[in-house]
């Protein structure tokens, strides 16, 4: 998993509440269990005017020119500004996979669905909860300033706006550690390989049936 320290990037405003995981990545794309390759179909039913199909190129598909991610001013955005209850619906981990594969590293919203919130941390995305009034002010600033960027400093737990306004945010210390060091569940386990091997060596004689080669 890519380590997270500080991100300075364009902000894309998705001004909709209750965005569910089926909107983030529609159900027909869930056949793959690889983490990569979902970005082109992120928000597929909103980005395109026809229905996408797994395994088919998006080249030539008619775009919804009014959708935020199709607007030139938000090209290359890595920070997503959202509304309440982002990531609700089914627990599919494909949703953060699609967001990460598209390029997003940060999502700022007043609230998130619990499972989606947890899955973001496991996939290198920092979900930041802010008061609705703060989110409202950021939406207004993004709308007023083309090319609007935020700097998100995870070690300092600070968001900095173009005007220099500093906004603090909370993050669980363990999750912060994992993001800064690029540790997903597998990475965390691999940090304890020596302990795991020592345990196996100690217990093989007592329960050899549990350690079949």
UniProtKB/Swiss-Prot annotation:
GO terms for biological process: L-leucine biosynthetic process. Keywords: Amino-acid biosynthesis, Branched-chain amino acid biosynthesis, Leucine biosynthesis, Lyase. It comes from the Bacteria. Signal peptide: none annotated. CDD domains: IPMI_Swivel. Pathway: Amino-acid biosynthesis; L-leucine biosynthesis; L-leucine from 3-methyl-2-oxobutanoate: step 2/4. It is an enzyme of class 4 (lyase). One of its GO terms (molecular function) is 3-isopropylmalate dehydratase activity. It catalyses: (2R,3S)-3-isopropylmalate = (2S)-2-isopropylmalate. One of its GO terms (cellular component) is 3-isopropylmalate dehydratase complex. Its EC number is 4.2.1.33. Belongs to the LeuD family. LeuD type 1 subfamily. Heterodimer of LeuC and LeuD. HAMAP family: LeuD_type1. Catalyzes the isomerization between 2-isopropylmalate and 3-isopropylmalate, via the formation of 2-isopropylmaleate. This is 3-isopropylmalate dehydratase small subunit.
């Amino acid at each position: 998993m890519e380590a997270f320290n500080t991100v300075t990037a364009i902000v894309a405003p998705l001004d909709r509440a209750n965005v569910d995981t089926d909107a983030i990545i529609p159900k027909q794309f869930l056949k793959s269990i690889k983490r990569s390759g979902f970005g082109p179909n992120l928000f597929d039913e909103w980005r395109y005017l026809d229905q996408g199909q797994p395994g088919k190129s998006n080249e030539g598909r008619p775009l919804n020119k009014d959708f935020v991610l199709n607007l030139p001013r938000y090209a290359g955005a890595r920070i997503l500004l959202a509304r309440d209850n982002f990531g609700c619906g089914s627990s599919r981990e494909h949703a953060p996979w699609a967001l990460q594969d598209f390029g997003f590293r940060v999502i700022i919203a007043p609230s998130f669905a619990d499972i989606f919130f947890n899955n973001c941390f496991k996939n290198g995305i920092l979900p930041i909860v802010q008061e609705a009034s703060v989110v409202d002010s950021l939406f207004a600033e993004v709308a007023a300033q083309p090319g609007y960027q935020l700097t998100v400093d995870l070690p300092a737990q600070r968001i900095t706006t173009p005007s220099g306004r500093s906004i603090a945010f909370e993050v669980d210390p363990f999750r912060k550690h994992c993001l800064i060091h690029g540790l997903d569940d597998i990475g965390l386990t691999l940090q304890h390989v020596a302990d795991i091997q020592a345990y196996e060596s100690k217990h093989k004689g007592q329960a050899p049936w549990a350690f079949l080669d």
